[in-house]
């Protein structure tokens, strides 16, 4: 343990929220910084920060700002929700942006204030939202050229200090081995559950042993970001040549807890 400070419309993006991402904004360059905001206020505490929007090289742009709730589906794809109430640990209701809409002249940098207050009585743990800076097509001062549109987003994480306990487990593990192809492939799927109140990013390995417990090979397990209370399917695909026989596959994940999470399977290569 450690102390640390229905929407009917949803958009699914095939990306991990580890920083900033963009939807096309046209030929001219537009930038938003920083890619993520983190705050650690206590229950009832006020927090404040800012993001900077850098204007296009030669175009005036109309801009609006807002927050959206998000989470991951079991495969790790990001899901955004246009209506609130779908995400249990959402921080969106606590957050404010100012200004909400403005005209950004070419080559000008604009500061956007982000602030809020954690409701009194909020339990310790991680809460989150996503800010968006959307560029609206604007032609009031243009007679030709590219019209810029699209949006840039970044993550907001609020950690309410207290007893934040990283707990989790591997609830399922399957293993396969294909020999029909030119390159024999070891495959499988791990389902990891985050049973704690903080965001986990487990890393680990898959150990392949023979029945005499001799280590034959090691396969890295892809990293994943798993929200509190969520399950994540982690796919395994790795080229590995094995002789015929039975083997033991041991999945080991370090998620920051006192012990590694583990799961064992026996499989056969024919």
Predicted feature descriptions by range:
Residues 27-61, 99-102, 168-185, 189:
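Beta-sheet-dominated interaction scaffolds and their linkers
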Residues 41, 102-110, 223-232, 259, ...:
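Short proline/glycine- and polar residue-rich coil/turn motifs
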Residues 55-59, 71, 120, 137, ...:
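Short, acidic/polar linear motifs in exposed loop/turn regions
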Residues 117-123, 237-243:
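Short, surface-exposed loop/turn segments at beta-strand-coil junctions that are enriched for proline
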Residues 127, 131, 245-253:
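A short tyrosine-centered beta-strand micro-motif
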